[in-house]
């Protein structure tokens, strides 16, 4: 756990979050941002960089896809930001699950 990381603090139960899924290695939470009707975050419980987590994205991708299908039957988008230029705001690796409306060409 990184004490400065809000996601690590959520995983440790030190910060509130609406947890939608959790297992031994990952968690899915409701994003506090609400740009589209469904904005969720899927992440490993272990603090990892985006590039490190994407090297082994199988389980997170599978669960994120399943939850996306369940919550956004009309379609959804999975996306991640890598680094400052891509507007990555948290160092803890995570995947955005976006949907619940027509997303257009460039949302997320």
Locate the predicted segments by residue.
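HIT superfamily nucleotide-processing domains
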Residues: 1-108
